[in-house]
Design a protein with these regions (language model features):
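Non-catalytic interaction/Regulatory regions outside core domains
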Residues: 1-167
Length: 167
């Protein structure tokens, strides 16, 4: 899959169980340093862009003359690094705090994945980065620890799928 294909949305929706009743995931998005955020899906067709960007991509492109540079790519690329960018991580007007960072070895491919837990008050989001630099942002639905644990598992499973696809 290329970052510009429309398949990403459906793949996210399927792998993160966004069509199920009471899913653990509220919204998810994929990001790369080359493309910025290039796919976002929400539960039950909800507009997921509002969780990851200040404005929708089409409006953003018009507003900045087609330059999709409004994602803070430099800062976003550090979310799964040892040291965060000094600006921190700001998504759609929310300053997220990184609570933890882990290196996880994918059981199927043996690929090393980087997993970060972000917090904004009682809200949480998992971010997993593949070796090829594709990041999956998974916003947990609600504040329960069970949903956070399930969303973590779904995020890792999805990135395992990406690693198997060569990402």
């Amino acid at each position: 899959m290329s970052p510009v294909t429309e398949q990403w949305g459906e793949v996210l929706r399927t792998h993160l169980a966004l069509g199920e009743d009471r899913p653990a995931v509220r919204a998810a998005a994929t990001f790369s340093s080359e493309a910025g955020f290039f796919a976002a899906v929400g539960r039950e067709g909800e507009d997921a862009w509002r969780y990851f960007r200040d404005v929708a991509p089409a409006l953003q492109d018009e507003a900045d003359g087609g330059n999709r540079g409004r994602d803070d790519v430099e800062a976003l690329c550090t979310v799964c690094e040892e040291t965060l960018h000094p600006r921190g991580l700001r998504l759609a007007g929310v300053d997220w705090r990184r609570e933890s960072l882990e290196r996880v070895t994918d059981a199927v491919t043996g690929t090393e994945l980087y997993l970060a837990l972000l917090r904004d008050g009682s809200r949480s989001m998992w971010v997993v980065r593949t070796r090829q630099g594709v990041c999956t942002f998974v916003l947990v639905d609600g504040e329960t620890e069970g949903h956070a644990t399930e969303a973590r598992s779904l995020a890792l499973d999805f990135d395992s799928f990406l690693a198997g696809q060569g990402y």
